[in-house]
């Protein structure tokens, strides 16, 4: 006679330990290709939406007003502040695709103002205010936050330190601010997975920039010329992208139903459109 016990979990309730039926991913019913495509589309929309906030002159101006003489130091200390009192070299390793000497110097400048935790709090509130100001007209912000929080809850934190740090930051209560903050956390999840895949590929950070967005971005991330173009590693870079998208697809397949996967991709694309329409150029 088989002996059965119960296993309790705060999110999924109680299950018999002898239950032989595995719990299938929620995303069943959608082909693997569709799942990966939706995950890739949502990832691109989230990345671009958060980049609008990170790169906007208004954000830099607010960092300057908060005491960061160099607003890039405010960005580095703000985004990396959840790592705690780390060395510049450690933060540069986590940021992965920045020129490390310059990144380390920006970190030291930034944490000298308010410390690491204080910088993270300032940056988090800046993200919230940016969402309130420019995302309020977007449709489905509550759903972006709800679905995003479910994905954040199931995603492992191992080897993705910025995601691990940001996922425990308190979220704003209002939908526009909360939605942008949730997208911010999801951006760190995908970026961390991408960096892990990149590190295994043999593609250097500067080669990755050249294979992705080219010399303008390479310079923006602090790399000096001449730039190694990595032209012989195009196929490898494509596989890095595919690996990242497949892993994100696995996670969304656990967190969401099939219809919700497509829904999130559509809502984040619409949110990005709203930002592009409302944010001053």
Regions found by a protein language model. Name each.
Residues 14, 112, 249-252:
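Charged, low-complexity surface segments at secondary-structure and domain boundaries
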Residues 1-26:
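N-terminal amphipathic/basic-hydrophobic helices that include classical n-h-c signal peptides
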Residues 18-230, 274-281:
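Phosphate/adenylate-binding glycine loop and adjacent helical scaffold
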Residues 5-6, 14, 206-208, 212-216, ...:
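A composition-driven signal for long, intrinsically disordered, charge-rich low-complexity tracts
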Residues 216-281:
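Accessory, usually C-terminal, subdomains that scaffold auxiliary metal cofactors
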